[in-house]
């Protein structure tokens, strides 16, 4: 990962701290994964505070596949089956069936409808009957152990929410360029500058979690 591009956002620990502060304030963050992995960047918001306007930005600036990152516990609570029984995707991305709020939505595809669906899924007393399947929101099941177990955007999202003291649910979508191609690190940095969003990497988050583990040992 080209650290010189990220230097304006501080060192790895400072970048994570800035991201946590932004999430607590209801703002978005940009997370890049390893260059030898997907080499992509995701726009991420806290599920509990995401607004219609932020969802509209995500739909406009990203790939359109809006994903709700959930813990395994929440997936079980909602009784969401996995999208496929035998996952053959290269990085084992753990999609469940897609969802829609059972009440309060129209077609389910608008920014407001997707926010309604997300709020239904993350409510404290959420039940399987609160959701219809299929829908326009794509839940992802995070692996237990977070980025120390799997260095994916799903795990990074849940880790960030937990470290920020928020509900362990986040919304992500892959940032794209105007021509529809995937945004890389230079594009993330430019987008972060334009929208005052912190930029960090999954490697930063791994280092941060390892440091916390060492301090508590």
Curated annotation (Swiss-Prot):
Q: Where does D-ribulose 5-phosphate bind?
A: 37-38, 42, 150-154, 174
Keywords linked to the UniProt accession = Lyase, Magnesium, Manganese, Metal-binding, Riboflavin biosynthesis
Listed Pfam families: DHBP_synthase
UniProt KW Transmembrane keyword: no
Could you tell me which InterPro entries the record lists for this protein?
DHBP_synth_RibB-like_a/b_dom, DHBP_synthase_RibB
- Sites binding Mg(2+) 1 sit at 38
Record-marked site positions (Essential for catalytic activity): 136, 174
GO MF annotations for this entry?
3,4-dihydroxy-2-butanone-4-phosphate synthase activity; magnesium ion binding; manganese ion binding
UniProt-listed GO biological process terms: riboflavin biosynthetic process
State how the cofactor is bound.
Binds 2 divalent metal cations per subunit. Magnesium or manganese.
Q: In which pathway does it act?
A: Cofactor biosynthesis; riboflavin biosynthesis; 2-hydroxy-3-oxobutyl phosphate from D-ribulose 5-phosphate: step 1/1
Reaction(s) catalysed (UniProt annotation): D-ribulose 5-phosphate = (2S)-2-hydroxy-3-oxobutyl phosphate + formate + H(+)
Q: Which domain of life is it from?
A: Bacteria
Residues engaged in binding Mg(2+) 2 = 38, 153
EC code(s) of this entry = 4.1.99.12
Q: Which cofactor does it need?
A: Mg(2+); Mn(2+)
Family membership: Belongs to the DHBP synthase family.
Q: How is the quaternary structure described? A: Homodimer.
Write out the function statement from the record.
Catalyzes the conversion of D-ribulose 5-phosphate to formate and 3,4-dihydroxy-2-butanone 4-phosphate.
- The name of this protein is 3,4-dihydroxy-2-butanone 4-phosphate synthase
Q: What is the lineage of its organism?
A: Bacteria, Pseudomonadati, Pseudomonadota, Gammaproteobacteria, Aeromonadales
